[in-house]
Amino acid sequence: MAASVLNTLLRRLPMLSLFRGAHRVQVPLQTLCTKPPSEEDSLSPVPISPYKDEPWKYLESEEYQERYGSRPVWADYRRNHKGGVPPQRTRKTCIRGNKVAGNPCPICRDHKLHVDFRNVKLLEQFVCAHTGIIFHSLYTGVCVKQHKRLTQAIQKARDHGLLIYHIPQVEPRDRDFSISHGAVSATPPAPTLISGDPWYPWYNWKQPPERELSRLRRLYQGHLREESGPPPESMPKMPPTAPAEASFTGQTDPQSAL
């Protein structure tokens, strides 16, 4: 029994010595009192653009010409996505606080570009020159936030008369816009109505053959009163009856039937 207790103490002796050695380490008070740097301080802030008040001057500078040239700012941009099929909408925003997402959109990647209704040269790059339609965000690659700002700035620039678009005039073709076509002109009357013939040919009177007439005479001998000629040109018109007389006759007919 005593041997087992002694072995247990010998096993725990090195652990106790290490624990005591750890307490003997001196830690300076300065390291314990200083605050750890916050995430906002550790991250580099977004640089401030010198063209914030006058953003149109950046598009006239040599720096812009060296970087973009005569092409739009979104010409060389390629979206970064997972898989072979790109998502059907761009990201909501590229900058959240001081954090800039990887591969930001063409507007967010250059801090000197500012969406403003007075920056006409920048807005013209996102509008079709032929139709005046704003390019879709999937075509230009800008995020949803910047696309919304672009749409508002373009509409405001049009209201102020700064941004206009020209639609070329196309001369209409005579064949497409002619009013002499049969489908758009007055319908002429049928030739049969002009000549006085009936609309359908089987309504016209035709003299039956003499052989057929002789057969019918033999068949209905003694029952035929007289031979009828061609039908009259116009049927006799019946005199119109007054509504009161018609209602009176309609009421008296059932009584007479009884």
Swiss-Prot record:
Matches recorded under InterPro entries: MRPS18B, Ribosomal_bS18, Ribosomal_bS18_sf
Region called Disordered, residue ranges: 218-258
Keyword presence, S-adenosyl-L-methionine: no
Family annotation (Pfam families): Ribosomal_S18
Organism superkingdom: Eukaryota
Modification sites for Phosphoserine: S38, S49
Compositionally skewed regions (Polar residues) per UniProt: 248-258
Record GO terms (molecular function): structural constituent of ribosome
Gene Ontology terms: cellular component: cell junction; mitochondrial small ribosomal subunit; mitochondrion; nucleoplasm
Ribonucleoprotein listed as a keyword: yes
UniProt feature, compositional bias: Pro residues: 229-242
Transit peptide: 1-35
GO terms, biological process: mitochondrial translation
Subunit organization: Component of the mitochondrial ribosome small subunit (28S) which comprises a 12S rRNA and about 30 distinct proteins.
Family, as annotated: Belongs to the bacterial ribosomal protein bS18 family. Mitochondrion-specific ribosomal protein mS40 subfamily.
Name of the featured protein: Small ribosomal subunit protein mS40
Organism listed in the record: Macaca mulatta
Gene: MRPS18B
